[in-house]
């Protein structure tokens, strides 16, 4: 299991068994160019094993004014299977959710700062990103993708937006409460949603990516 650990400001792997009374973790990466991360928030795993993750300041007690903050940039990073770390996005005020398209050719990143947008990037064979563009104009938090390429955006308007691969709004899953993330599970047809103090689930007629 991979974790973006806000408080410990690192990307880690669960190193202990599920039934271990006190969990232990292995740090995969904890900083960039000698400086600690702000507070890693979300992770997307490429089929080649590379990790892409966002690093906004939301886990710092005083946000951007916190004296423990070391990095000026709220970046998006790529950690290769071989352990090489690069910053692939540096111009988003608050990168948050992150997810790959079904063919791994596009990377989506939600920006929770101003302007509130969902960005899309081409993923080059080298692993670098290009062709930065606005995919959809909306505030968003966590992201999930189904096998048809539709993008599920948690966060706005007390629900989850469903946006087609062409960037058109298909509908909204109304939770009546603010949501923070969503992910496919079970047999792939179940979408789990974190919403305030609740964990919700809904059965869909399309599977999530990876199932």
For each predicted feature, which ranges?
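Beta-rich, blade/repeat-based domains predominating
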Residues: 1-5, 32-51, 70-75, 88-106, ...
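Short loop/turn segments immediately following the C-termini of beta-strands
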Residues: 6, 56-58, 112-113, 156, ...
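Asp-box/WD-like beta-propeller blade repeats and closely related beta-sheet repeat scaffolds
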Residues: 8-67, 73
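A short loop-to-beta-strand structural motif that recurs across blades of beta-propeller domains
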Residues: 10-12, 74-77, 117-119, 159-161, ...
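Flexible "stalk/tail and boundary" regions
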Residues: 14-23, 77-86, 135, 148, ...
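Short loop/turn segments immediately following beta-strands, especially the blade-tip
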Residues: 14-20, 120-128, 203-211
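Beta-propeller fold detector
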Residues: 23-30, 86-90, 129-137, 171-175, ...
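Short, structured patches in soluble enzyme cores that scaffold and shape functional sites
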Residues: 55, 80, 89-92, 102, ...
